[in-house]
Design a protein with these regions (language model features):
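Short, solvent-exposed, Trp/other aromatic-anchored flexible loops in extracytoplasmic proteins
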Residues: 73-110, 116-120
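Primarily secretory-pathway and cell-envelope proteins
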Residues: 1-79, 116-133
């Protein structure tokens, strides 16, 4: 399942904006094995629209009928740093993001990953799902 959420302050109907930008967001594989150390996320942007992004990427496990963050193995060294932003001079056709999973307990189940981008005051939230067997 891939979802794209596009938010622009003060604008309720963003269907026209979604038509103007075509972004594909996909996990490298649909199914991973237990204790996979990393996953790669690819975002293709076949437009010349520059997108800003930070280090943030959210990872969730489907548990008890809701999406929950997975349990971390050791939280004593965890540093959260996602307030920075990057903008590349020319819009690349393909972005690749690597997400380390070896810090988490990754049991079998259904997962989703989210990555946010922005363009001025507009925010794009991309989501994709995968499975661990």
């Amino acid at each position: 399942m891939k979802t794209l959420t596009w938010q622009k302050p003060g604008q309720q109907n963003v269907a026209q904006e979604l038509i103007k930008i075509i972004i594909n967001y996909v996990a490298e594989l649909r199914v991973y094995t237990e204790n996979v150390p990393v996953i790669n996320i690819f975002v293709s942007n076949p437009t010349d629209i520059l997108l800003e992004f930070g280090r943030d990427m959210r990872f969730y496990l489907w548990k008890n009928d809701k999406w929950c963050p997975p349990e971390q193995k050791d939280t004593s060294y965890t540093i959260v740093w996602n307030s920075d932003a990057f903008m590349i001079e020319k819009a690349p056709l393909l972005y690749c993001f690597r997400y380390k999973l070896n810090e988490y307990c990754i049991p079998k189940g259904k997962y989703r990953v989210q990555k946010s981008f922005s363009r001025g005051d507009e925010r794009i939230l991309l989501t994709d799902s995968f499975e661990v067997k």
